[in-house]
């Protein structure tokens, strides 16, 4: 008999139920729909009837998975009518038992456990994001947050630690301090080892105390090193998972180092979790402008017809940080910039950009189209990749360290802190269009942007008649993900006057100027999606496999041949080789032009 998963949604119910009764045909399951009367109106209530052929018995399950009634179908000449009567009787008894909830409040609770609560990610991102969701009223009415890590700490000490990183998005917002106090009262702590069944069992007992008999939905956020993912998942799954609600686990990158280790990690996780319980987080997919990418394309007629090789000459995905590893070199040296940024953040954005129109906005439909893009990509040639590493540089009397000056980095390390690559998609829409990626640390600025450079105007009338620069007859769409989120389109126009001189101007949508509301942090969106079961912005296992299949051969060749990176000064625009790579494909990096 197939297992029946409990629904995410639960509702309070009253004693007057039947407004409609509609069986749905099926061998083993039939869905029954009722309307439950409440002071707020009529609410739909879905039940599932499960028939057991061998015994002839039928069980009716509530939305929360609880059995309402068991009956023998042979005992009733009209089994559906008999079941209906039994269900109504059982629901009336249940309503009397639970008590009428005239306010319609949910009888479920969400328990969020941050595993690795004493780490930087938890302190700087996860707890502040959870507080922001609470402040905006986005968390369920009944929720509890537990920090879990090896550090010895009390509830009060956790709250003191967390309180230092909490802020309201806009200063002096009403009731900010009061909201913080309310939020911190919902935060608790349990110390334990990540591989201890006993410690997770103790956590389970504490969670149950706070859940107070409600349907328990549990979310575990693994903010821990990848080498202990599986141990923590095993313990959480076997000793602290929900017995009557859902259990979900958010896994932070890196998801392995290559195809082999990624597949092994996925296989190990699936020993204890189903695929739909695993939420692989890439926080860049939660950024506002990345989310707006699909809206921009699919809801504006002026863009969608141009979204192909016929009009687009190249696409650039640019990521830069103006700081180095600075103490995190030990972690970074094991992965490098290609694994850290390109294989996940930039490749995920590329897949969203290049995908075909999905059937719907459903998570599976979108992820299906992204996988098709990744599987259509041409293997990356090592000749189409430039790697670099920042070196020491003195500017304004200040000396900035080289990557290998970091005490946590092995001397003589060849790990790249910069990479540029040209990628191609072998399908009808994008054949021949170079997709350029560039990512680096210790560069001249901090930014992340998508640049779409359109083809030259055919015939270039103004170049022929006035001698204007050829590039003045092209357009560029820029989506600035960070900082100062914006979308702008570069167009050509005539400079006022008697002559015929062209100028480039921007049609600019600067978010801070257009919208008074501050943009939510990416972690807020992703945490809320995980709580609500929305998987659109999380990475499916076949997406991950396709991404690693693309980059693993390149990484092996670079590392096995010990390719020496091109050195560039701290605070510069990166190695010169990146410009030669772009020129090779008849492209100029958009972020180096005068007007940018």
Swiss-Prot record:
Expressed in roots, leaves, stems, buds, flowers and siliques. NADP(+) 2 binds at residues 438, 451, 480, 488-490, 573. It catalyses: D-glucose 6-phosphate + NADP(+) = 6-phospho-D-glucono-1,5-lactone + NADPH + H(+). Its main location: plastid. GO terms for biological process: glucose metabolic process; pentose-phosphate shunt, oxidative branch. Optimum pH is 8.5. It comes from the Eukaryota. The keyword Repeat does not apply. It is found in: Plastid, Chloroplast stroma. The active site is at residue 345. D-glucose 6-phosphate binds at residues 253, 283-287, 321, 340, 441, 446, 482. One of its GO terms (cellular component) is chloroplast. InterPro entries: G6P_DH, G6P_DH_AS, G6P_DH_C, G6P_DH_NAD-bd, NAD(P)-bd_dom_sf. The modification N-acetylvaline is found at residue 60. Regulated by metabolites. Post-translationally inactivated by cysteine-mediated redox modification via the ferredoxin-thioredoxin system in the light and this avoids futile cycles with photosynthetic CO2 fixation. It is an enzyme of class 1 (oxidoreductase). Pathway: Carbohydrate degradation; pentose phosphate pathway; D-ribulose 5-phosphate from D-glucose 6-phosphate (oxidative stage): step 1/3. Its EC number is 1.1.1.49. Residues 1-59 form a transit peptide. Catalyzes the rate-limiting step of the oxidative pentose-phosphate pathway, which represents a route for the dissimilation of carbohydrates besides glycolysis. The main function of this enzyme is to provide reducing power (NADPH) and pentose phosphates for fatty acid and nucleic acid synthesis which are involved in membrane synthesis and cell division. Belongs to the glucose-6-phosphate dehydrogenase family. This is Glucose-6-phosphate 1-dehydrogenase 2, chloroplastic. It comes from Arabidopsis thaliana. The lineage of its organism: Eukaryota, Viridiplantae, Streptophyta, Embryophyta, Tracheophyta.
């Amino acid at each position: 008999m197939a297992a029946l998963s409990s629904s995410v949604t639960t509702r309070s119910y009253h004693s007057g139920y039947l407004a409609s009764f509609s069986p749905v045909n099926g061998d083993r399951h039939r869905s029954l729909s009722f309307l439950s009367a409440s002071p707020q109106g009529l609410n739909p209530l879905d039940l599932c009837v499960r028939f057991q052929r061998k015994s002839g018995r039928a069980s009716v399950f509530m939305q929360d998975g609880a059995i309402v009634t068991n009956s023998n179908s042979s005992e009733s000449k009209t089994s559906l009518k008999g079941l209906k009567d039994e269900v109504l009787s059982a629901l009336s008894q249940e309503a009397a038992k639970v008590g009428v909830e005239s306010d319609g409040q949910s009888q479920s609770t969400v328990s969020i456990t941050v595993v690795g609560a004493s780490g930087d990610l938890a302190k700087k991102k996860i707890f502040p994001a959870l507080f922001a969701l609470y402040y905006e009223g986005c968390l369920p009415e009944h929720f509890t947050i537990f920090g879990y890590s090896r550090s010895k700490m009390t509830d009060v000490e956790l709250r003191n630690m967390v309180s230092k990183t909490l802020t309201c998005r806009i200063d002096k917002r009403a009731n900010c301090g009061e909201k913080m106090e309310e939020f911190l009262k919902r935060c608790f702590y349990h110390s334990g080892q990540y591989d201890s069944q006993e410690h997770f069992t103790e956590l389970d007992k504490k969670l149950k105390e706070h859940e107070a008999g409600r349907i328990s939905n549990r979310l575990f956020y693994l903010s821990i090193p990848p080498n202990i993912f599986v141990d923590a998942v095993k313990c959480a799954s076997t000793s602290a998972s929900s017995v009557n609600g859902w259990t979900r686990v958010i896994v932070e990158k890196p998801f392995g180092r290559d195809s082999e280790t990624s597949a092994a990690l996925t296989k190990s996780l699936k020993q204890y979790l189903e695929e739909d319980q695993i939420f692989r987080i890439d926080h860049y997919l939660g950024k506002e402008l990345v989310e707006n990418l699909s809206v921009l394309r699919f809801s504006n007629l002026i863009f969608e017809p141009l979204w192909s090789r016929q009009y687009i000459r190249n696409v650039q995905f640019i990521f830069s940080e103006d700081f180095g590893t600075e103490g995190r070199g030990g972690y970074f040296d094991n992965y490098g910039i290609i694994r850290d940024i390109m294989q996940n953040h930039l490749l995920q954005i590329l897949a969203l950009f290049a995908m075909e129109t999905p059937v719907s906005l459903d998570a599976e439909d979108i992820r299906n189209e992204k996988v098709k893009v990744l599987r259509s990509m041409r293997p990356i040639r090592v000749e189409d990749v430039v790697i670099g590493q920042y070196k020491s540089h003195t500017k304004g009397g200040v000396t900035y360290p080289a990557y290998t000056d970091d005490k946590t980095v092995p001397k003589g390390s060849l790990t790249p802190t910069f990479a540029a690559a040209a990628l191609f998609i072998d399908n009808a829409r994008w054949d021949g269009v170079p997709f350029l990626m560039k990512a680096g640390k210790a560069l001249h600025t901090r930014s992340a942007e998508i640049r779409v450079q359109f083809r030259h105007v055919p015939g270039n009338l103004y170049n022929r008649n006035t001698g204007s620069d050829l590039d003045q007859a092209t357009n560029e769409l820029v989506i600035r993900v960070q900082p100062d989120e914006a979308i702008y389109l570069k167009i050509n126009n005539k400079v006022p006057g008697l002559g015929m001189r062209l100028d480039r101007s921007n049609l600019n949508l600067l978010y801070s100027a257009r919208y008074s509301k501050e943009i939510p942090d990416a972690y807020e969106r992703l945490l809320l999606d995980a709580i609500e079961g929305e998987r659109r912005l999380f990475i499916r296992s076949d997406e991950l496999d396709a991404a690693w299949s693309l980059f693993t051969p390149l990484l092996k060749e670079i590392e096995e041949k010990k390719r020496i990176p091109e050195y560039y000064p701290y605070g510069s625009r990166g190695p010169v080789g990146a410009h030669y790579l772009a020129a090779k494909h008849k492209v100029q990096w958009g972020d180096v032009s005068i007007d940018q």
